[in-house]
Regions:
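Short, small-residue-biased leader/transition segments that mark boundaries at the very start
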Residues: 1-6
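Solenoid-like repeat scaffolds
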Residues: 7-9, 43-51, 178-187, 232-242, ...
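Short coil/turn linker motifs that delimit alpha-helical repeat modules in TPR/alpha-solenoid proteins
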Residues: 10-11, 50, 96, 135, ...
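Amphipathic alpha-helical repeat scaffolds of TPR domains
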Residues: 12-25, 54-76, 120-162, 185-212, ...
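Conserved positions within tetratricopeptide repeat
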Residues: 16, 35, 55-59, 101-104, ...
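Short coil/linker segments at helix-helix boundaries
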Residues: 28-48, 68-133, 155-168, 204-229, ...
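Amphipathic alpha-helical segments within extended alpha-helical solenoids and repeat-rich scaffolds
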Residues: 167-177
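Extracellular polysaccharide-recognition and catalytic grooves
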Residues: 189-191, 204-272
Length: 272
């Protein structure tokens, strides 16, 4: 089981598999085992020489810290923020802002060596159950896997007063991905998908919905207009590729949502 994999220190691929399985099946660790895990992983990440293994360990650490916060939400909500530079040695005494900083540090570190991560296939690291449809178009590279994990981990910071950090980092990850794939030979499909994922997040998960209604309507109209422009650019640039069907579908949906004035255009999009 996952315990065994974690003890086998040299085997990072197995360990990542164990963690991803645990997440997929939503098995929860007890706070005590999380606590022990975090200390072991921290020591290992410091000493690991292989850059890809190191990146994976950072990704796992970010997620474990975020999980630890969520388990202890009640406890942390009553704590006064401590100075980040003077974090107590024992994480059981930390305040939530220190955890947020840790999650952020490890997420950033996990994506630092993007060039190297692009060269590594994620297949040997990922249990089959998790290679969902999306990643086959991304070519199963490790960079995409860790970037997607970092986004998910930042999303776990909801409710910990980290909204602006969360938005800034997630936008940065998507923009970095789009830029990276755009400049990489043979990564057209990944470029299209990263762009669609980015906009999906931007329209649903980037905090627009928390604004007062009048502001929200204006912002949403603005974002929808930008989204339409982005879809048109994708279609213009990659329209001949099979993957671009996704962009056509998104465009038809968007026009339908934008209202009747755009219906004619929506029908025309479907005909294309």
């Amino acid at each position: 089981g996952s315990e065994m994999c974690i003890r086998d220190r040299k085997n990072v691929p197995q360990m990542l598999k164990a963690y991803i399985c645990r997440e997929a099946y939503q098995e929860r660790l007890t706070p005590d085992s999380l606590y022990v895990n975090l200390r072991n992983l921290e020591n290992w990440a410091k000493s690991e020489q292989n850059p890809v293994s190191k990146a994976i360990l950072h990704s796992l650490l970010a997620r474990e810290y975020a999980d630890y916060m969520r388990y202890n939400r009640q406890l942390l909500s009553g704590r006064t923020a401590l100075d980040t530079d003077e974090a107590p040695a024992d994480i059981r005494e930390w305040s939530s802002n220190i955890f947020v900083t840790k999650v952020d540090e490890h997420n950033l570190a996990s994506l630092q060596d993007s060039v190297r991560l692009l060269e590594v296939s994620s297949k040997e690291y990922v249990p089959f159950v998790v290679l969902e449809d999306g990643s086959r178009f991304y070519g199963h590279d490790m960079y995409h896997l860790l970037a997607a994990r970092a986004v998910d981990t930042y999303l776990l910071l909801d409710g910990f007063r980290a909204d602006s950090l969360q938005r800034m980092r997630i936008a940065g990850i998507y923009e970095g991905m789009i830029n990276t794939y755009r400049h990489r030979a043979g990564a057209e499909d990944a470029t299209v998908l990263a762009t669609l994922d980015y906009w999906k997040w931007k329209r649903t998960g980037s905090g627009i919905s928390r604004e007062p209604y009048a502001t929200y309507r204006e912002r949403k109209a603005q974002v929808d207009k930008e989204y339409l422009g982005a879809l048109d650019n994708l279609i213009r640039e990659y329209g001949a590729r099979e993957i671009c069907a996704e962009a056509y579908i998104c465009k038809a949906d968007l026009l339908r949502n934008m209202g009747a004035s755009h219906m004619d255009e929506a029908l025309q999009t479907c005909d294309e």
